[in-house]
Amino acid sequence: SFLSDWKIKKTKDALSQVNLHPTFRKIINIKKESRRRATFAAKRTKKGSMVGFHGRASDIIVEITECPVSDPILLSGMPTFSKFALLGSSRKAVLRISATVSGKSLDVKVDNGKELSATEISKFAQICNQSKIIRLMWNNDVIAQSNPPSQTMGLAQVVPPSGAFLQATKTGETALVETVLEIIGPAKRIVDLFSGCGTFALPISNKAAVHALE
């Protein structure tokens, strides 16, 4: 497609300027509504609350009702995020809400929230139970969890830390893993630097000994 060819050309031109001329693989285009993680901004307003994304290089929150690239499960959390802003933030504070899809559920990490009382924590747990949120971390403390928010990596089920980096789409992750497995070929000893949660190390471990570092 025009867009794929344009992206490859832009990358080739940039690398050629530093005398690098790698072989390029075909670009894999990901279908819409497949992004599985996003960071929302939420705050109280005079009339209630608002949830959206920060404008580029801006403190302005752009309120959204839809997002064509995001998994619908992500967007299903927005009414709950609005409640978080109403109940868990001061008038001037903006909540940073990092949400990740885990199966049919959500793993959510909230930063910049107010300190919660025991009664408020209980209320938030009830809110989560009425939504798709299976784990809620509030200012670095897990205050609600009904099930472990696991991710499949190779043959393993991994529960990443709240807000941990994952490839934006599962399809993209699968393509990268398949490419890495192809590149390492029959090698039996592998070192994985910056291994994160094990995106590459765990699938590789099915065929080789892996020393993973982060």
Each model region followed by its residue ranges:
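Accessory RNA-recognition modules of RNA-modification enzymes
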Residues: 1-214
